[in-house]
Amino acid sequence: MSAQPVDIQVFGRSLRVNCPPEQQDALNMAAEDLSQRLQDLKVRTRVNNTEQLVFIAALNVCHELAQERLKTRDYASNMEQRIRMLQQTIEQALLEQGRISDRQDTQFE
């Protein structure tokens, strides 16, 4: 479906943005999250300039995103290592099983 204009409220300001209908709930939640972040920053930093608050919030979000990407990369690397170890364990077990089967076959001849 194509994006449709949607009115949202962010930090007391009305914004009209285009959004696919199936993503409107996520957009509203994001707008609420941003509003809360801006309000928290305003209280914590005592900065009243909305533009400055928006830049600080954007930097914080970018930092959080970078941290999550790093965590995801580390997790994927860890999983790849575990999969390789599991594959090696399985291959070793199959080789040993094959050796045992070969020994048993020669005993019955």
Swiss-Prot record:
Gene3D superfamilies: 1.20.5.50, Cell division protein ZapA protomer, N-terminal domain
Disulfide bond positions: none
Primary localization class, coarse: cytoplasm
GO biological-process terms attached to the record: division septum assembly; FtsZ-dependent cytokinesis; septin ring assembly
GO cellular component: cell division site; cell septum; cytosol; plasma membrane
A Pfam family the protein falls into: ZapA
Location in the cell: Cytoplasm
Keyword Cell division assigned: yes
InterPro entries: Cell_div_ZapA-like, Cell_div_ZapA-like_sf, Cell_div_ZapA_eubact, Cell_div_ZapA_N
Keyword list, A-Z: Cell cycle, Cell division, Coiled coil, Cytoplasm, Septation
Coiled-coil annotated residue ranges, if any: 22-99
Superkingdom to which the source organism belongs: Bacteria
Family statement: Belongs to the ZapA family. Type 1 subfamily.
Assembly and oligomerization: Homodimer. Interacts with FtsZ.
Function: Activator of cell division through the inhibition of FtsZ GTPase activity, therefore promoting FtsZ assembly into bundles of protofilaments necessary for the formation of the division Z ring. It is recruited early at mid-cell but it is not essential for cell division.
Alphabetical list of PANTHER family matching this protein: CELL DIVISION PROTEIN ZAPA
Protein name according to UniProt: Cell division protein ZapA
